[in-house]
């Protein structure tokens, strides 16, 4: 998702500050045309506060949007660190808006990803906004006949959601394979 956001911003003439903090896969860093900087903020299973301070020091003076890819393996500890250390309020005081992008997937993971979104929305303070990406790759984003917009996870947090992005369900035989190939090769 980070690569898509950064590419979109670049296509609009913006120059976002791109940072990859994923401790397992530095996929975002592989997009050389996006000038992604790699930062190691994890120390084992925990956030290294000194390294995290370096991240904030990069964000603070930025006049452009900042796109950070943190990866699934560090998402829970990073979210916990952000909330317990009141980082969203700090960023807000610096004139920045924290926008958390989260993915809801269809199929078997639907209930888990809905629950994850609801937990994020309840844990993050009011300063944080959310962009929800609906990914139908594994199945439709529906539960018991209700669409995402009808589900409690959304209706209870609707005011916090800045946007909902529907990822198109591309046929693998055509555009789906092309997009997959582009992403694998980290092309922009």
Predicted region positions:
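NTP-binding/hydrolysis catalytic cores, primarily Walker-type P-loop NTPases
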Residues: 180-188
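P-loop NTPase switch/communication element
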Residues: 24-41
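Short beta-strand-centered segment that lines the nucleotide-binding/catalytic pocket of NTP-utilizing
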Residues: 12-26
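Glycine-rich, highly charged phosphate/nucleotide-binding loops
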Residues: 47-56, 82
């Amino acid at each position: 998702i980070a690569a898509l956001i950064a590419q979109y911003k670049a296509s609009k003439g913006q120059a976002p500050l791109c940072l990859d903090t994923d401790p397992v896969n530095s996929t975002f860093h592989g997009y050389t045309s996006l000038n992604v900087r790699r930062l190691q903020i994890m120390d084992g299973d925990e956030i290294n506060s000194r390294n995290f301070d370096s991240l904030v020091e990069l964000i603070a003076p930025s006049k452009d949007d900042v796109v950070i890819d943190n990866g699934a393996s560090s998402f829970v500890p990073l979210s916990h660190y952000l909330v317990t250390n009141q980082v969203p309020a700090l960023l807000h005081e610096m004139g920045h808006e924290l926008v958390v992008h989260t993915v809801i997937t269809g199929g078997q993971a639907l209930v888990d990803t809905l629950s994850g979104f609801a937990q994020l929305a309840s844990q993050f303070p009011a300063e944080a906004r959310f962009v929800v990406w609906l990914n139908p790759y594994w199945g439709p984003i529906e539960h018991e006949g209700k669409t995402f917009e009808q589900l409690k996870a959304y209706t209870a947090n609707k005011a916090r959601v800045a946007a909902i992005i529907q990822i198109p369900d591309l046929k693998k035989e055509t555009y789906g394979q092309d997009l997959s190939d582009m992403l694998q090769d980290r092309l922009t």
